[in-house]
């Protein structure tokens, strides 16, 4: 039986609080006393209450509005909360003395909701204890690293009915959960002035009719969501229909809702400001809990304090920087300036010699190429550097800047600096191949044929007898920074080692996505003259080997659950094009364009 909102609210209060007065119902629901009186008459006429209490028919009617379960989404990295989220999931942080997800579970249990599922992914093992402590169910989202949270909803779609959808890191100052809910809703709070949040427009009965990202003086989405069975039954087929589309991978579950908003009935549940907190940054949580940082058990912040000699309370303006393919980095400031904390990415300990990187950083500092470097822990892989305000990356399409980059390469190569470690694209590629095989047989079409070509190119290049010197080996535009004074820095020396001088050119061409004309021009800048055919051939051998090496590296990262994206295809294409071409140049001993 379908109940009007007023009838539902009145019947619910009568069921939960036997003997409750109409005045108390009005206070609890926000309905006027007259509306409560009208609802009492309506419920009596429908035989849903008898003598001011719910009848058996009334309790049966209320049952279809009973909340069945709750889903807590806890799979994501929460990159905006870096660097704390590098160490543990955001939902496990302690705010005002309580662990966020535990507080939320306790609020659900207090509302009589005992069927609780936690969807995990990033650092999933940190959540397993919740099964024993609270009796929750754990569901692992295997796609958390490559897809947005619509994948978490997909993992539990068969559990959706009358269901709360929650985020593990929300903090509710009052318990928002209820045993009975009238209709699907999204919690909203009011923002005075401009906001970047998702702002809602509503129609009759507060149904959400449209949503815009950003607005002013608007109600915006925040906190818990409730799917009633009608919403769940309509939403799941819509999600299934688009799930396998590549465009869906980056979509939040809300995007699928918005794409179908005319067909999905969801209302806005309005809350007073200060009821729901999501803490999008460290500074936000510190405003709410001034002692948060002091009470935080964080190796990252301990590292910062120990290296810089600052107080933990000084650390501020913490926010993530654009993440690299191998590491996670964040900005922070103290009273002494701005800095970058680099946290090693998952699996990098098997790929990178951090002792060599630390030694190379010191050499780069001494050469005046990277004086941002402050400290690196060679055992753990974390690093602290100075932050360069208003910095920009080198433009690989700007000939003058390319010339400067090539002069930096020549400076490094011609220095007497040396490392104990070596770097070789072919050896590295074979190392990555071994790591890849740990995930099972390599059944990528054409893989073995490409690996055989790489071996032949390596043999030809070695026979050239080219100089071995200190090389950067991740030498491309994103690792070049220009400051406000046009000073050029070459950063991130984690792949550095003693190698064939052409290694840096190979990386540059591949990772800057140079065409052949641009590559040849860069080579002219490197030699400060037109290169010989033999020099062209040798350097392009390293373009081929760099492409192949990073292609195999990408396959490893994808196998580990990381999302490399288009770079995998870029690396593959350079390997495919130049492995065959360079072999032809060696076999035929002349250069051919195209």
Q: What residue spans do the PLM features occupy?
A:
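Conserved core of the sugar-phosphate nucleotidyltransferase
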Residues: 172-248
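ATP-binding pocket architecture of kinase catalytic cores
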Residues: 319-426, 440-448
């Amino acid at each position: 039986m379908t109940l009007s909102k007023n009838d539902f609210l009145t019947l619910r209060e009568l069921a939960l609080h036997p003997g409750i007065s109409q005045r108390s119902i009005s206070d609890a629901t926000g309905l006027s006393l007259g509306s409560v009186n009208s609802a009492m008459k309506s419920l009596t006429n429908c035989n849903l209450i008898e003598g001011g209490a719910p009848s058996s028919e009334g309790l049966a009617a209320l049952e279809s509005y009973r909340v069945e379960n709750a889903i807590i989404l806890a799979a994501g990295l929460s990159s905006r909360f870096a660097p704390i989220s590098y160490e543990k999931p955001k939902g496990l942080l302690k705010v005002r003395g309580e662990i966020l997800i535990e507080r939320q579970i306790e609020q659900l249990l207090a509302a009589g909701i005992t069927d609780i599922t936690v969807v995990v992914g990033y650092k999933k093992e940190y959540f397993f204890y919740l099964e024993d402590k609270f009796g929750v169910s754990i569901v692992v989202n295997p796609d958390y690293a490559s897809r947005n949270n619509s994948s978490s909803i997909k993992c539990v779609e068969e559990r959706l009915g009358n269901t709360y959808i929650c985020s593990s890191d929300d903090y509710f100052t009052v318990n928002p959960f209820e045993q009975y809910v009238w209709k699907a809703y999204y919690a909203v709070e009011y923002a005075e002035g401009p906001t970047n949040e998702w702002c809602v427009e509503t129609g009759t009965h507060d149904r959400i009719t449209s949503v815009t990202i950003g607005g002013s003086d608007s109600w915006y989405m925040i906190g818990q969501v409730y799917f009633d069975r009608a919403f769940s039954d309509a939403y799941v087929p819509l999600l299934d229909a688009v799930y396998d589309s590549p465009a869906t991978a980056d979509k939040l579950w809300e995007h699928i809702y918005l794409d179908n908003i005319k067909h999905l009935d969801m209302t806005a549940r309005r809350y007073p400001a200060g009821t729901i907190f999501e803490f999008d940054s460290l500074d936000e949580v510190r405003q709410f809990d001034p002692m948060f940082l002091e009470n935080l058990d964080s190796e990252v912040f301990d590292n910062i304090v120990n290296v810089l000699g600052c107080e933990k309370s000084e650390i501020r303006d913490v926010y993530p920087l654009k993440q690299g393919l191998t590491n996670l980095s964040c900005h922070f400031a103290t009273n002494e300036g701005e800095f970058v904390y680099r946290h090693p990415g998952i699996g990098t300990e098997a790929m990178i010699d951090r002792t060599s990187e630390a030694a190379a950083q010191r050499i780069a500092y001494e050469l005046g190429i990277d004086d941002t470097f402050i400290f690196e822990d060679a055992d753990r892989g974390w690093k602290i550097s100075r932050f360069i305000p208003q910095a920009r990356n080198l433009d690989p399409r700007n000939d003058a800047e390319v010339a400067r980059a090539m002069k930096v390469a020549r400076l490094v190569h011609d220095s007497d600096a040396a490392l104990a470690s070596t770097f070789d694209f072919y050896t590295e590629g074979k190392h990555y191949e071994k790591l890849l095989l740990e995930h099972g047989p390599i059944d990528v079409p054409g893989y073995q044929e490409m690996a055989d070509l790489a071996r032949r190119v390596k043999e030809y290049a070695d026979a050239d007898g080219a100089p071995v010197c200190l090389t950067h080996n991740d030498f491309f535009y994103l690792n070049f920074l220009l400051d406000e004074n046009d000073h050029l820095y070459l950063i991130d020396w984690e792949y550095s080692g003693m190698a064939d001088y052409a290694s840096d050119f190979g990386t540059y061409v591949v990772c800057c996505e140079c065409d052949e004309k641009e590559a040849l021009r860069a080579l002219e800048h490197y030699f400060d003259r037109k290169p010989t055919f033999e020099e062209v051939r040798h350097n392009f051998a390293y373009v081929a080997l760099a492409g192949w090496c990073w292609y195999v590296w990408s396959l490893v990262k994808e196998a580990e659950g990381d999302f490399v994206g288009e770079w995998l295809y870029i690396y593959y294409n350079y390997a495919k094009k130049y492995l065959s071409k360079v072999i032809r140049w060696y076999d035929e001993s002349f250069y051919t364009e195209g």
